[in-house]
A protein has these predicted regions:
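Acidic donor-binding segment of Leloir-type glycosyltransferases
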Residues: 72-117
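C-terminal catalytic/acceptor-binding lobe
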Residues: 2-36, 47, 68, 229-304
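Conserved catalytic core of nucleotide-sugar-dependent glycosyltransferases
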Residues: 151-237
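Short aromatic/hydrophobic "clamp" motif used to bind/position activated sugar donors
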Residues: 141
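Glycine-rich, basic loop-to-helix element that forms the pyrophosphate-binding segment
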Residues: 118-135
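Cell-envelope/extracellular polymer assembly enzymes that use nucleotide-activated donors
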Residues: 51-55, 83, 252
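The conserved acidic donor/metal-binding loop of glycosyltransferases
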Residues: 145-149
């Protein structure tokens, strides 16, 4: 069996998943599941021109990834070098074409790094994140989603704020988000015109405070990433899957590091929220139910 073969189902898989979710709530000590964290004093407090790496995944979200990559072209860093790593599958032909188009661009301060995975490995996001964490040479690694953009002053301010820091995990205090957009919204309904720089009006976003390093906002110290990986020792989260897996490992990662993260005032962190989930089968009953549940959940939150 190669490393990306889908393992046969086991009777206890569902129980194992539930156990890890309960453990990650803090009810079980994280040190039982990982090696000792590198002490803060032994982490490099990098300064000067930093090396940053952004790690993103894309499956059937080329229309969102186009905005993310465009933001790096439109607002390239000047006080750091950013390696933009994207995990993708060649079966997603729109994303493959988009990466080829952007990959031909020379952008000051940006290094393109496209990492192909078979889709069964892509469907478990922790697999790519773990590979990137262990292989990265960056001072800091930003694990994110392909619907996030790095707009004006985002990466340069981040580089300034990270000077000399040794935190295990930091995150933006404010995330600027759109409303939850339906598939027919002009921002999402780009037709076939993906191979171009995508523009978005700053007025489309509102400020939303964040209290922890959620999945797209996990900015991790490079020494921590290289020694811990990304849920490396939770083998349940390193198993390929035939279908997209909900990213419960985001919470497990914070639990393993023993922190919700340190908030930083980073401008220009913008996300396009979207109702239709491209990673699920279009028209599928479960997909429609998920959309209904998301709408209901957001409506409840907005009324609080």
């Amino acid at each position: 069996m190669n490393s990306y073969s889908i393992p046969p189902p086991r009777w206890h898989d569902r129980l194992h998943g539930w156990f890890l979710r309960i453990a990650a709530s803090g009810l079980i000590p994280a040190h039982m599941f990982r090696p000792t964290l590198l002490p803060q004093a032994e982490r490099q407090g990098a300064s000067g021109h930093l090396q940053l790496e952004v790690v993103s995944h894309c499956w059937q979200y080329a229309y969102l990834l186009a905005y993310q990559l465009s933001s790096l072209v439109q607002f390239p860093p000047t006080r750091a070098t950013v390696t933009m790593t994207v995990y993708y599958s060649r079966e997603d032909t729109d994303t493959t074409a988009l990466l080829a188009w952007f990959g031909a661009m020379q952008v000051p301060g940006v290094i393109w790094n496209w990492r192909e995975l078979p889709k069964q490995a892509l469907f478990r996001r922790a697999i790519g994140r773990n590979e990137a964490a262990l292989q990265s040479r960056a001072d800091w690694i930003w694990f994110t989603d392909c619907d996030l953009m790095f707009r004006r002053n985002c990466l340069d301010t981040l580089a300034d704020l990270l000077q000399g820091r040794r935190d295990a995990l930091v995150f933006p205090r404010i995330e600027r988000c759109t409303a939850v957009l339906p598939a027919q919204d002009p921002l999402l309904n780009t037709g076939q015109a993906l191979l171009r720089l995508m523009e978005v009006d700053d007025a489309s976003f509102v400020d939303l405070p964040r209290t922890r390093a959620t999945g797209p906002l996990q900015i991790t110290h490079g020494d921590i990433a290289r020694t811990q990986g990304y849920c490396r020792d939770l083998q349940f989260y390193q198993r390929p899957s035939a279908t997209w897996c909900k990213a419960y490992e985001d919470r497990a990662f914070r639990w393993l590091l023993g922190t919700q993260g340190t908030p930083l005032d980073i401008p220009g962190v913008c996300r396009i929220r979207h109702e239709t989930k491209g990673r699920y089968t279009s028209g599928d009953l479960n997909a429609r139910l998920r959309a209904m549940i998301r709408r209901l959940g957001r409506a409840i939150k907005e009324r609080r």
